């Protein structure tokens, strides 16, 4: 399933997309790092809420972490591990994606 064009995601930035995973429609966070893209479910492990403060609008700390808009949990962007806040030691649920020919696809 095609999720996005790579160029539609700013380098070092985020995008929110909807995808079918199994039988469920899920909101995903896409994070672009050069020609790589990492993806996670748009759900904070602390309280099960979306991480964006408005649809598709994500907070990034000075340290380069994704910050949950609800309770301030901070997630590093390599594996999605929570490094600060109420769910420290937990992690975002990763979703496998791949970049092919300038497009981001669900793997």
Listing of model-derived features with the role each one plays in the protein:
Residues 44, 68-71:
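Short cysteine clusters
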Residues 1-62, 76-77, 91-107:
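N-terminal pre-ligand scaffold of iron-sulfur
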Residues 85-87:
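Axial heme c-ligation environment in periplasmic c-type cytochrome domains
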């Amino acid at each position: 399933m095609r999720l996005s064009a790579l160029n539609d995601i700013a380098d070092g930035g985020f995008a929110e997309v909807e995808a079918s995973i199994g039988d469920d429609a899920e909101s995903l966070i896409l994070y672009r790092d050069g020609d790589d893209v990492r993806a996670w479910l748009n759900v904070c492990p602390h309280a099960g809420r979306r991480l964006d403060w408005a649809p598709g609008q994500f907070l990034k700390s000075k340290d380069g972490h994704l910050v949950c808009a609800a309770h301030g949990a901070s997630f590093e962007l390599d594996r999605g591990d929570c490094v600060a806040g109420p769910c420290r030691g937990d992690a975002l649920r990763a979703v496998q994606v791949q970049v092919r020919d300038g497009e981001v696809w669900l793997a």
